[in-house]
Amino acid sequence: MRKLFLLLTVILPQPIKQLFYRRVFGWKIGRRVRLGLSYIDAGSVDIGDDTCIGHFNVFRKLAKLEIGPTTYIANFNQFFGSDMRGAASCLVLGTNVRFMSRHFVDVAGRVEIGARSTIGGRDTQIWSHTIRIRQGRQQLEPADVRIGEEVYVGARATLICCDIPAGAMVGAGSVVAKSFPAESSRLLLAGNPAAIMKRYPPADIPPSSTDG
């Protein structure tokens, strides 16, 4: 029944839709938020002021959805939580994030995208689960993905259970399957598997990016 209500809410006029989300589900939705024809199914939701979510996005089986102010999510994106054991299914987008169209995010673990970061182009995939051998058997386990502040991710990149430091750029088509520690310079990560291709001057890197 809950899923049916959420599905029907998608087509409601903007003021009624947001009122329904607040009153019925207790979600926190800021001022001047615009919600397009997108399906949102999450346990708790906190959307900051002036955020815009476009059309035909799907947020499914999320335990927690947190979106900072002035963030923009375009169209046809998929954010899928998981029922696997230990799944956090937590998606956190910082302030002024730009998330363009036709991307896929597996939110089995915790996926964080820092302030002023951009997921550009189309067809990028972000995966937050891995497979391990437990007592001789294969077992899926959730893992985290952390994208720092002011990161740019190019089209058709694949990010798997990794940390991307603040200020980094991920080249189009790259496959990032390991974490890269923060440095005093901006990193260009590219290739399959991704490696550090170039270091740029540290101008404008957020102070937090070099903290332990």
Where do the protein language model's features map onto the residues?
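Residue-level detector of alpha-helix boundaries and kinks
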Residues: 5, 17-18, 36, 102, ...
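Flexible, glycine/small-residue-enriched loop-and-beta-strand segment within the central core
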Residues: 40-47, 52-164, 179-182, 192-193, ...
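C-terminal/domain-terminus segments
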Residues: 169-187
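A sequence-level detector of short, solvent-exposed, charge-rich linear segments
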Residues: 39-40, 86, 187, 208
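Terminal amphipathic alpha-helical/low-complexity segments used for targeting or macromolecular assembly
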Residues: 1-32, 50, 116, 130, ...
